[in-house]
Structures are given as C-alpha cells and as structure tokens.
Amino acid sequence: MEGVIQQFYLKSSILKTSLHIQSFCSFRFNKIILNGETVVAKEKGLSFSEFSKTVYKESGIAYPKFFKMDNLSKLTFLTAEVLLKNCALPSEEKEKMALVLSNRSASLDTDRKHQLSIQSKENFYPSPAVFVYTLPNIGMGEISIRHQIKGENAFFVFKEFNAKFLMQYSEALIHNKKASHVLCGWVDIEEDAYRSFMYLVSKRGTYIHSEAIINKEYQNI
Amino acid sequence: METLRQELKENIIEQLNLEDFTVDDIADDDRLFGDGLGLDSIDALELIVMLDKNYGIKLTDPKEGKEIFVSIAVLAEYIATHRTK
Amino acid sequence: MKRGVAITGMGIISAIGTNVEENMTALLFSKTGIGEISNITTRHQKDIKVGEVANTNSQIAKSLQLPENTIFSRSALLGSLAAKQALENAQIERISEYRTGLVSSTTVGGMDLTEKHYKTFQSNPETLKYLKSHPAGDSTQKIAEQLGITEFVTTISTACSSAANAIMLGARLIKAGKLDRVIVGGTDCLSKFTINGFKTLMILSNENCTPFDANRKGLNLGEAAAYLVLESEAVIKKANKKVLGYVSGYANANDAFHQTASSAEGEGAFLAMQKALKVANLQPEEIDYINAHGTATLNNDLSESVAIKRIFGDAVPDFSSTKALTGHTLAAAGAIEAVYSIVSLQEQCVFPNVNFKQPIPELNIPPAVKFQKKKVRHVMSNSFGFGGNCSSLIFSSE
C-alpha cells in the first residue's frame, strides 16, 4: 500500500509558495532531540513510564493530569510540550493551529490493557479511565486542552512514517487558510518501544518544508 | 473508621494516579471534586469501580456518586454502612 | 453558486436495513432497530439495548462470495458490503478507469476477533492468524481489495467523528484535483470491548434511548457501515452521471475541554458548524434540517443544543437524531447519517426524533417529532467524538 501512496504523490505534486518548519522534536531510546541537538539523554534501561515521569518532573511543568494519561498520550503530550515551548507562539496563534498526527499502532498499547481488564471472569472490572484512552486521537485532545488548540484535528493510521502525506496535508491546510500553523508528526508506542517525531509547519522558520528534510529529521534519532 | 479513611486515601492516590499527593496532603474534610483534589467525571467512575471491587458496593447511577464522593469523611461513613465485603 | 463535491452513489447496512431502500423505509416509518443483543454473549445482555445488524458473519461472507476460511473481522464484512453497494449504486464497473481512492474509518477494527481468540493466542499459536485483523487499517485494506482500489487507501480514526472526517478528506482530495473518485465512509461492529467500555462510563441506557429529551438516560450502541462515492466535476460531465447530492461544507474543530466530556458552551461543536457554513458559503437560515449528533447522553445533547442555539439563535431549523433508531454506530455514525441526510434531500423530508417527550429545560428547543415533507435544500450533519474532535458536514441538493 505504501509504495502505491508514494507513487500517487509523485504524480500529483503541485507546490505553491514554500512553507517552513520552525522546529523539530523527537523522542526515542530515552533521548530527546530538539532541532538536531540532544537535549535529554537518560539511561537506556529505563522503562517508558520511568523515562516519561523523569522528563515530566525535570521539565518543571505543573500539570497533574499528566499522570492520568495513557502512555501514547504521555508521549504525545511531552513531545508537544518540548516543541511548543521552543516555538513560543502567542495564544491566538495556538488557538488556530491544526494537528495532524499519525502512527502505526493506533491505541493498541492501551487496547491491550483494557482487554486485560475485561478478560477475567472472576475479576471483571473494566476501568473507565483506561477505556477513555483506547482511541489514538485522545492524545491530540490532551494537547488541545493543554495549549487551547481549537483548529482541525486529524489522526491517520499508516504502516510506516509517511512524510509526503503529512507534508501535502499541512500544505493544503495552510494554503486553504484553515490554519496558520500545523503541528505534525508521528507518535507510536507499543510497551517500551516508542518513537515520536513532531514538527511545526509555518509560513516562516529555519527549515524548508520538504519531504527530504522531514525524512532526514525523522531518521535523526 | 480511621483505618478505613487512611486506606481510602492510599487507594485513591493509587487508583487515580494522584502522583503529586501523599496521604498527609489529604484532610478528611477536603473536597474531592472541584477545587479540592481536582477530580473529574472519569475519576468519579473509577471511584465507582473501586467501591464495587473493594467493598462490594454497586452504584448504578453516576448521580449517586456525587452525594457520596464529597470528602474522605463522607465516603468512609457511606462505605462503613453499606459495605458487603 | 460555488458547487460542492458530487455524490454519485451510496451504500449502507445498519440495524434498520441492509441497503439504502430498507433504511429509507425504516426512516419514513420510524421503524426502530434497537433491541436486545443476540450476536454477542455478554453479561450485560439484560441491561443494555443495542442497534444490531441482524445478518450473521457467515451470511454476509456468503453474500460477498468470500472463499471459505478467509478471515474478515465483522467491521471488514459490514464495510465491504456497504462499499460494494455504493459502487454499484454509482454504476462504477471499472475502478481503474479513473484515479480512485478509499478513505475508511473505524474505531473497533478487528477487536471482535481479537477478543474472541485472545485467551488462546499463547496456548494455541494456530489462532494467532486472527491477530492480523486487529489493526484499524486491516478493515480498510480488506475493503480496498474487495473493490479493487490500489491508488490511494487510508484509515481515519478519530472516535465518533471518524466517518465525517473521512468524508471531509475525500471531498478535499477531489477539490484539490488529486483524485477523480473517492469512496468515503466508515464501519464499526459491536464488540465486548466497546460495550464494556461504554458501560463503565455509565452512559449506556437500559432502555430505548431518548435523544434531546429532558429525561434521557444515555445511549444505545449500534453497528453499521456506510460509504459514499464522491466524484469530480470532470468525471460527472464525461460520463453524464446522475448526482444524488453534493458535499458542500465541512469542518473540524477541537473543543479543547476534556477527553470525553463536551464543554458547557459547546465550543468545538460551535466552531465546526460555523466553519462548515463558511466553507459552504451559506447563512445559518439556509439550513433546512440538522441531522444532529444527539447520542442521548446527558452531556452531549445539552452541549450540542447550546452550540446549535449559539449558531442559529431564535431560528433553530428542524433537527433530529436518528440514533434513536440505529443506535450510536461510532466510526460509522457520520457515514450512515450522511446517507440519511442525502435521503432527506432526495425525499424532501425531515425525520422525526423518536422517543422524545420533554425538551431539555435549560434550552427549550425541541427537536422535530413528526415526519414531515418540506423543501429541503441544505442539510447539516454533526458528529462529535471523544478527544474533543468535532465535525460538521453540509449536504446540498445542488
């Protein structure tokens, strides 16, 4: 399927005025990379829960709701936190921002936990707090609440990271004046194997908004 | 009753992932929702599950929860009278 | 006038019928599909009501002429059936004739098979083959194979607004000239996973649900699939195709309030409706009917009513929720309600909001309670999902 999508885009690449990327941020292997620079590096042995808790504590954010989130939302939340702090947008810009995220495992990590809570006949207590997170877009909801982002939200499920798709989707949003900024990327987690990559597309910025650059930065961790 | 209150505080912190709180931070009369511990509607549902699981109390209407989940003191009182396990 | 994107075909299977005609008849006579659950064994059997599709998996597989031993989740089966109907309705014979895509939404995916075989995955590796159907994308891929679509295939999963977002993406792909034809819609089957999940949220009613009623007790889950065929102006002209209606407006916005609860002001819903009107270049008074999200939960119906009031003021058009007949079909809801919106345009009628008795006291805006014939040119369809994901679509007759 992926090969076909790639081809499809090659056939129809029409580019208008070029857009830019303000910042990139990735989380993987207990490291955080911001605009090519490693800003946090923790022991490889830490689980995602331990790693995310440490990052939360060290960042000095006071947002107790963080601890209630599932791991996919925690990953989404922290990546957006580091990225948006670096971009420092005024709140009226944030309100109009669009979110376009993607991954391959949807909410599988939390689905499993919910399934575990309903599979035992003797101990049948499905958790409402776990069930709420069995949708991949809940993480987008969490960052929308945190940053008061009210623009368009879309979550796509792909076999693998698809820079071209994300690129064209953000371009369409900005060119059709649906948004002035698009928070874009990939957030995927299955147990302790996690990987996030987010970037902010905007009319101005340090990097050119191109497939090659997005792919290069995605591979950077 | 004191033991039950203590147990409730521990359970609530654990079940609702209130990582920033310790048992000593929660007074018996603190409001659990709104300004107090800042719990929300999903937390109320988790508390309903906890009542069932730990004390054999089944609530079927979330509105009942509102009257019970006022504070640790009120909750402990309710559990002491209605518990089946 | 700025035209929207043409709809040339539709297909549907829901608790009130296995094709468009059956659904239409059920709507015209307010025939409900809500009843006791029969295809799934659950301890909640007596305390929930659902909108279940009567056909069993093997019946659907047979009608699709699937070879024996093929593994299709129920979402993939329902989706394949509805999508095939849509293609047939649009009289499409050769997919490869134009650049054709599929945008399908689901939230349940292959959960029905996973939960059935979960306990044996470790002890009996033979059952592991069912796990391949688990991902959301599997149902989309299966439907694409059934239709022979290879050009562009993707899945959207944004909770209960999923199908509305699939329709929005399809319309955009055509407007941007990237595709000539897109099959858009969604599919979700009932599963223990969703039944138990919604049960713990205490928003399932043990009776037939009563959207927008003052004494509403919660929702009934349902299962369904529906797809629309969207085609570009050029294809319509060249093939001289019959157009059923147009997707003229669409928008999505985030409520930015809570993971599951809607805000008291209905901010996300308000923004979605406002932006959809803007895209369609319409004034609020031009909307003749709103097919509301109307899940019959305390929270949604109040919040949605507030948002509707904010947009339409004292001139709220006829509105109703058809979920009282079909149940809430999650990622299929936006698609089946799109079909109903087009039926409203075709039949020039408004569907009643069944089971309604008393208006919500805070607002006092009652929904339409009687089936009525009237001039219908523009229909708004709302779909709001967990995560604050709110979408509004507008369908127009020309």
Description of each model-found segment:
Chain A
Residues 1-221:
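Conserved "HGTGT" condensation-loop signature of ketosynthase/thiolase-family condensing enzymes
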